[in-house]
Regions:
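Rhodanese-like catalytic fold shared by cysteine-dependent sulfurtransferases
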Residues: 1-17, 21-74, 78-116
Length: 116
């Protein structure tokens, strides 16, 4: 499956499972990057740190995500690197995972897009 771009993600915001694979502090906006004009996360996203994702067994990941096998999952981080790793892990576990390459670095620059 291909990466997802800003326009598609914004259009499908309420229907997608979105994983923010940044740290908890980046997710809640208490420790973001100074290059981003806004802090927080994409509304509806669940925080699942990529390092934790890599530490868990496949069974633990399936249990925590609680998604059907083959479910479409979008991963994002700050700039697309951690989410690329998460996407590969999720694909290896049978999910239809897509990377939002622009990630928070792109999303936070669009004042017309919601932030949680």
């Amino acid at each position: 499956m291909s990466d997802i771009v800003l326009e598609e993600l914004a259009r499908r915001l309420g229907e997608l499972t979105i994983l923010d694979v940044r740290s908890r502090h980046e997710f809640d906006g208490s420790a973001g990057k100074p290059c981003d004009p806004r802090q927080g996360h994409i509304p509806g996203a669940r925080n699942f740190d990529v390092y934790r994702l890599m530490e868990l067994s496949p069974e633990e990941v399936h249990r925590e995500l609680n998604l059907e096998p083959g479910a479409e999952v979008i991963a994002y981080c700050h700039s697309g690197s951690r989410s690329a790793i998460a996407t590969q892990v999720l694909r290896s576990l049978g999910y239809d995972a897509r990377n939002y390459v622009g990630s928070w670095h792109e999303w936070s620059r669009h004042d017309d897009l919601p932030v949680a």
